[in-house]
Amino acid sequence: HWAAPDDSIKIFYTGENLAPDFNACDYAIGFEWMTYEDRYMRFPLYYRYPDVNELMENRHLQDLDAVKKSKSGFCSVTVSNFNRDPMFVKLFDKLSEYKKVDSGGEWRNNIGGKVKDKLEFDKSHKFSIVCENSAHSGYTTEKLVQALAANCIPIYWGDPNVSKVFNPKTFINVSDYATLEELVEYVKKVDADDDLFVSYLKEPVLLDQQYCKDVQIGLLRKFIHNIFTTPLDKAQRRNRILSGKMYIDDRKKQTGSLSYRINKKYHKFVWDVKTNLRRLYWGYKGR
């Protein structure tokens, strides 16, 4: 995007844990809890999964006795990204000391192969490990929504402010416990008590209807509509002169330099090597 003309309107969008740089874009859509006039809208990645959101929003209206009877497994996890936060590995190992955690992805697969339908796989389990790639305020992804839609109790680690949107009575927050041992003891308690388990399913997932998918998609449409119906000269928001122009010119030079391109390729190479080594290691251990 650095090569785009200076008078172009730039809209930053991310599905990753990245904050927008308003020196480089006019508008942004992301995960951050922030307001910036008409330049920013919070629209987490999980809203791009409307069917799953609908299941999640209505899960407390189901026949909960039937849901309880459908649970034949203890806990599920479906992960194929081998570059995980260390907390995820620790949590998996600690829960596995209590009961087998069924891993249906490439990572530590222990069920004989990758699952084809994650939602159906999760539906047969009482709990599901849900760990974000990193812990950052506002960074809640589809992982939590998918587990809730599958009528699991998510064992969640990630966004420290997840309870601004999601009802804390519908999931177990790892961050609420001083140690993983303490957490596992509570999971054991819920696992052994059917009434306590069902109490998590009885609660509405969202704390406020403003966070339901239909409302948020409507707000996104208004946000985009405002940008494209505003005359070009008035829609421009970022500084394009003096220090603003110098900032962009510097970034263009950096991203176009040989050292930048070499460094980028080097980091990708290292990332790929680490990923493949981890895949080989866990593939060998799983034999």
Describe each region flagged by the PLM:
Residues 105:
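Short loop/edge segments at beta-strand edges and connector loops
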Residues 1-6, 11, 19-102, 112-130, ...:
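Pol beta-like nucleotidyltransferase catalytic core
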Residues 15:
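Nucleotide-sugar donor phosphate/pyrophosphate-binding loop at the beta->alpha transition
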